[in-house]
């Protein structure tokens, strides 16, 4: 009986073994896909942010302190790399434009224009910028903030003919080399006009500017309640004569009587890559 049981067990094991050997080998497990590389930091889309409403902007003008040039030359040579590292850190949330004002302005050597969808992101960049060697030796001489908005007055609905003129005017000059930042503040009389009265004033304001739009690019930022001004006007041009004539035409419109601030400061600078600007101001005394 014992022998028979052993034989049955042995036969069973052989049957199991035979079944395993007789079956085809299982397919190999598929190789694991390599881990995906982290996505590269994607910079803010410049064209998109410059044309969108609701975007925050910070303008700040700076004067280099004379004691910056007491810093060792080797350290000043590294200033541009340090600033560029800050730009790289924040490139997903801000775009930064730089302008050299030294030689044009008494109270500044350069200014920055920072755009961001979130005001906190612009502030974070500026805080980090001021912590660089170059930033620590740059005193802020003016600071203005604002936001972009859709057209308030010369829109398709309110003023279709002028809107068509604005939309059809395309900059056709050489690449702009110069930029202007001009703050504007209106008086209480302006804000107490009816919407229809302000629309009429703005139509009178807009009409004489149309011939200059082929020579001068412009952008408007709204600051009421955000700063001590109502608007920040920004212009780019390669034709300073055309810009001067544009300003003369604006000075002659009735709407100018509502201004309590136009400029003060008016800041003129040359458009510069920020790396070049830092190198220029770090090497020269």
UniProtKB/Swiss-Prot annotation:
Induction: Expressed under aerobic conditions. Significantly increased upon shift to anaerobic conditions. The active site is at residue 218. Ca(2+) binds at residues 105, 227, 266. One of its GO terms (cellular component) is periplasmic space. Heme binds at residue 205. It comes from the Bacteria. InterPro entries: ChdC/CLD, Dimeric_a/b-barrel. Belongs to the chlorite dismutase family. Catalyzes the heme-dependent decomposition of chlorite to O(2) and chloride with high efficiency and specificity. Used to detoxify chlorite, a by-product of the reduction of perchlorate, a primarily anthropogenic pollutant, in perchlorate-respiring bacteria. Its EC number is 1.13.11.49. Residues 1-38 form the signal peptide. It is found in: Periplasm. This is Chlorite dismutase. It catalyses: chloride + O2 = chlorite. Homopentamer. GO terms for molecular function: chlorite O2-lyase activity; heme binding; metal ion binding. Binds 1 heme b (iron(II)-protoporphyrin IX) group per monomer. It comes from Ideonella dechloratans. Its cofactor is heme b. Keywords: Calcium, Heme, Iron, Metal-binding, Oxidoreductase, Periplasm, Signal.
């Amino acid at each position: 009986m014992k022998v028979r049981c052993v034989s049955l067990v042995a036969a069973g094991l052989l049957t199991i073994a035979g079944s395993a050997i007789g079956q085809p080998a299982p397919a190999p497990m598929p190789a694991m896909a390599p881990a995906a590389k982290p996505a590269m930091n994607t910079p803010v889309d410049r064209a998109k942010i410059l044309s969108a409403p609701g975007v925050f902007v910070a303008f700040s003008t700076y004067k280099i302190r004379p004691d910056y040039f007491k810093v060792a030359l080797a350290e000043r040579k590294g200033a541009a790399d340090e600033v560029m590292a800050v730009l790289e850190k924040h490139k997903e949330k801000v775009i930064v434009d730089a302008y050299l004002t030294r030689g044009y302005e008494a109270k500044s050597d350069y200014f920055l224009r920072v755009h961001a969808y979130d005001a906190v992101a612009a502030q974070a960049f500026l805080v980090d910028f001021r912590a660089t060697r170059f930033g620590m030796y740059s005193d802020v001489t003016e600071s203005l903030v604002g936001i972009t908005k859709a057209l308030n007055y010369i829109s398709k609905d309110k003023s279709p003919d002028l809107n068509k003129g604005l939309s059809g005017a395309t900059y056709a000059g050489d690449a702009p080399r110069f930029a202007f930042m001009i703050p504007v503040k209106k008086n209480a009389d302006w804000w107490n006009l009816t919407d229809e009265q302000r629309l009429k004033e703005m139509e009178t304001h807009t009409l004489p500017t149309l011939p200059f739009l082929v020579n001068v690019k412009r952008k408007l930022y709204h600051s009421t309640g955000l700063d001590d001004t109502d608007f920040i006007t920004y212009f780019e041009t390669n034709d300073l004569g055309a810009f001067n004539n544009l300003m003369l035409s604006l000075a002659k419109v009735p709407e100018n009587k509502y201004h309590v601030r136009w400029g003060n400061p008016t800041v003129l600078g040359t458009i510069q890559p920020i790396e070049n600007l830092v190198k220029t101001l770090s090497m020269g005394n």
